[in-house]
């Protein structure tokens, strides 16, 4: 069938400078640079060398903008397939989201005149958030989410998109080394002894560890890696999550999500084979430390919300187990306009 004139124009507008050349980065699409977001030192009581990776400067305010760009890249592949006659029409995408990923993806789809996003949300989601997403073009589907893990088929069925693709799970995409690969290199290039990162869907956490594994195990090295291999071998990556359904870090509590392939056995294997540091794991947060982290963030004008700054909360919770003079990187995944 080929492409319409409109689709041909969209195809030509999606520019991908390179897959992994640090001198030809792909994100953010309007002004690509590597690193794409800043890392700067912050003051934390009792610690002397703490740095913040700040994703709040992204287009919609969170690290999900990186995932959103990859959706545009995916649509370029769809367009090329349609141009070659492999498919007859562009598929729609569906996602299970608390809001930030849906906002970021729809923002990019709208910018490139691509099909609007189908979004599955919990029926308890704030009306203001639902209204905002609808306003920018998302098609919202509300259900009561329980503890049952939803797979990609469930999500497509609930969003009435049986011929489309679910981008929540990792079954159709290589999420663990694709959505956040550039970001992961920016993170490990810091040569930190300890990296603290929010663990919601698990995609970012797993991506970081898989990039570390790739760098330590593969003979061919990625040109984006500028760090120290000896430090990387010992770097511990600590994920912050919660089992509290009433936590202010609401994006970290989602028992129904099709998580990335995180398991204690998997991370134990990485530790035992020398791929990651001894403290690499996912830890449950105590709510009191979220309050302390937010207080520190406010005093230093860090743009964040509780889920995004949960890595700092975990550091405060574990402060007696972390050497005070070690280099520490806190990943702030940011805050959207809907988190105000």
Task: Cite the ranges covered by each PLM segment.
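PLP-dependent amino-acid enzyme catalytic core
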Residues: 1-340
